[in-house]
Amino acid sequence: MVLNIPLLLSGVLVPIVLSVLLPFLGRSLGKKSITAIAFILLLYPLALTVFFTIQTGLREPVVDPVIFQSDSLGSFSALLDPLSAPLAISIGLVTTLIAAYSLPYMEHRFEEMEKEKISAPDWGTYYMLYVMFSAAMMGTVLSTNLVEFYIFLELSLLPSFLLIAFYGYGNRERIALMYLIWTHVGALVFLIGSLIVGLSAGTFDFYDPISLQPNMGLGSAVSPALRLPVAIAMVLGLFVKLAILGVHIWLPYAHAEAPTPVSALLSPNLIGIAGYALVRVAYTLFPDEFSHLTNYMLPLALLTIIYGGLMALAQDDFKRLLAYSSISQMGYLLLGISTLTTAGIAGAMVHYAAHAVGKALLFTTAGVLIVQLHGLRSISKMGGIAPKMPLTASLALIGFMHITGIPPSLGLWSEVLIISGAAGSVLSKSAIAFIGLLIALLIGIGLSTAYAFLTMKRIFFGQPSEAALKAKEAGWNLLAPMAIIAAAGVLLFIWPSILIDPLVSLLSSLLG
């Protein structure tokens, strides 16, 4: 379905453009009014994506009319289809609700910074950067063109860098710079590959908004000697963004020390976009070369799952544990993609949504504990908090269920799809490889379950700690956004077919 006006892109550009006014409005309006404006700006793209998803049932792509066309660059449009919808809905849901959560949390953070005599820009600047970051992420997953994708990818990097540098914890400026350098280098490596493809093919479109078809094999226009190196460059650049083992160094620092509302966007939403781009961009442009690279990607995915799980298990800082957990979860995402099966890739896209819900709940739980326990993040100093904070404990449990695949969580369906795709793919190659896969998955799933529920026990149950004696339940201004995210996750567990069925249909065609 081609729209008459570019509604999808308006959901990206309107929030970005209007967010520039927030620092000026912040001088005359109160923090609640600024929060409400930011919430409404982000509610708009969420409403658009949900409306078109329900209206079409994702049985056909929803495409904006071309808003820009050039003989050398191709055309700029926006696409909502079964592949992009799980990400667009997840980004819209989490960013909108975390905007509301930011009000009470950042009140606490501003008070902390004032006590520490740290100066930072005010509410208007915070929400301007927050809205830009959120809308740019939406822009990346709706893009149809390599240049368009790269612009939004970089636009998501700069505001998130400033949010960490201005409002983060610890050595926030140094950590923000590390985050900027690592992820910008990854984006540049991806850009180099993109430029070679676009200049060789005469277009940067990886999806044709006129024919409503992906430009499969567009990379074949590249010289045969360069095809594999270019494909490797694009994949490697995305691996940095995905924080795969070996290029993950930046993530535990950035995600742990970012202000918690930003952590709740970085970990579930931003990094997973690179997994989507592996399928939407890298596989579309270089199907043969990508297929060859999956022989190396699959074992790397398993190593990432295990490494992230082991490191999470060793952490005492709750936010740092969640950061390493995200590395492990991105391993599952890569595992599904590297199978190049319908089930595996469908599972990876559904896992993005499951991880978005689960990790958003867990980072916001960490934020609640920071606010209610006066900045406490050390798990060893917690314990026995559940009787004092039963609602927070319940929401944290739902979050852990999503990342471990326990019903009623969407993570159950993503895990089943990824494992079935991986088993089918590896079994067709060799029995020994299949046994190795089973062993690695048992270790990985065991580690995920261990760090999730040991952490749950250490924080919320057991002997009451000194912190537990002083604890009290958070207010609804913190808990209500979390409860809505949790409810959305359970709804998708009950109604997964709205995402999975169209995905299976599209991937069956895409993979041939």
Briefly describe each language-model feature range:
Residues 3-14, 84-92, 147-159, 227-240, ...:
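Structural signature of hydrophobic alpha-helical transmembrane segments
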